[in-house]
Amino acid sequence: MQSIVLGFFAVAWLSLVAILVVEPEIYDSAMKLPAGRHILAELAFLGAISALIALLVVGVLRRWRWTFWLTLVAFLIGGALRIPASVLELAGVLPPAGPAWYVLFQALLGLVQVTIGLLMLAGYRRAGPWDNPVDAPR
């Protein structure tokens, strides 16, 4: 389970970097910055998210319980909300958060998050947080 979550974090971080390089306007709109190039703000945003991902990676590697539960809840709830939000954005009901490819990518990430969250829940029932039999529920 740890490797799946770490893999997702790696893909998420690489995606953030790729979006910054290819379509930095997405960062600008997420941070509600005026039109123009804001490289320092974008790099600060990437740095803050990178620090959060790094902390979560350390927590996964050390099998910290709080990171298990935080990741589980974020993946189940966040992922479940991303999917219908993306559908509503594509249907024109909600204003789009970016180009169509970005909205579709968000929906795909939501689907992957929910799937990983369900796998984490099943692993918890079987062998405890992070598939650690010592911490398995009795």
Question: Where are the regions that the model predicts?
Answer:
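Topology signature of small-to-medium multi-pass alpha-helical membrane proteins
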Residues: M1-R138
